[in-house]
């Protein structure tokens, strides 16, 4: 917000239509390619409200439709009309917060069942969106608190209550997005713990197999040596049977020992 002698210049960052369309899909998922925010600049004077934006915006369309239905409200001044724009801008966060909440619930459900790489990528993308939304909400909150507390002469005292109402909504949304950020961090830590636990289970199985096979490999290596004076070479076919039975006994004893120690 920047104040001049006869005007007030304000910049806010509403959500883009493209992002809202992606968020509004039935499955509440998108690929993260949609740009979340755009820029809306406004100049307020005593009798004039000028807005500048780079693409069509829902809040401007809603204001235009409102004035077509209630033309007399336009006489209340630019500060009242600008409050309507900000109110529509803040209300657009509702479906986004619902999308984030649904996405976090989905991730929390599946992260322990099947911690796949695709879930990890989606978590990172969602966390980036939450951080970006949080930064924008904090910025918008600072703008609105200045408009709501009577810092500028161009905002009439009777309109401040409307700005305070929009500010209260924005504060509530900021608290919700902060809670979502903490929840996303917890889910990410849960995913990493589940992945680590899964890796430990795999290593446990591989280590168990290696431990069982190790004495068998040792026996095969000993009896595979070509020394003429080895006693077992004189046993003929029984020497072969003895080696197999010894290997099997080592494997059974190893498995029994693991069960006794409750390692399996």
Feature map (PLM): residue ranges:
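Peripheral, non-transmembrane regulatory/ligand-interaction domains of membrane transport proteins
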Residues: 1-158, 162-165, 169-176, 234, ...
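Hydrophobic alpha-helical transmembrane segments and their immediately adjacent juxtamembrane loops
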Residues: 168-264
């Amino acid at each position: 917000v920047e104040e001049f002698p006869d005007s007030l210049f304000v910049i806010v960052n509403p959500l883009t239509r493209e992002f809202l369309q992606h968020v509004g899909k039935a499955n509440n998922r998108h690929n993260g390619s949609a740009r979340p925010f755009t820029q809306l600049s406004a100049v307020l004077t005593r009798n004039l409200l000028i807005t500048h934006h780079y693409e069509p915006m829902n809040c401007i369309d809603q204001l235009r439709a409102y004035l077509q239905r209630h033309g007399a409200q336009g006489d209340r001044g630019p500060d009242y009309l600008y409050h309507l724009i900000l109110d529509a801008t803040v209300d657009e966060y509702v479906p986004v917060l619902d999308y984030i909440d649904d996405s976090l619930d989905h991730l929390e459900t599946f992260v322990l069942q099947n911690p796949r790489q695709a879930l990890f990528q989606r978590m990172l993308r969602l966390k980036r969106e939450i951080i970006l939304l949080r930064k924008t909400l904090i910025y918008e909150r600072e703008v609105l608190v200045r408009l709501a507390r009577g810092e500028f002469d161009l905002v009439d005292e009777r309109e401040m209550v409307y700005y305070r109402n929009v500010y209260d909504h924005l504060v509530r949304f900021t608290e919700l997005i902060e809670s979502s950020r903490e929840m996303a961090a917890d889910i990410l830590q849960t995913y990493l713990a589940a992945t680590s636990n899964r890796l430990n289970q795999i290593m446990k199985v591989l280590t168990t197999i290696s431990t069982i096979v190790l004495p068998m490999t040792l026996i095969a290596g000993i009896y595979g040596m070509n020394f003429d004076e080895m006693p077992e070479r004189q046993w003929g076919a029984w020497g072969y049977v003895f080696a197999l039975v010894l290997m099997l006994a080592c494997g059974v004893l190893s498995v029994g020992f693991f069960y006794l120690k409750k390692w399996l």
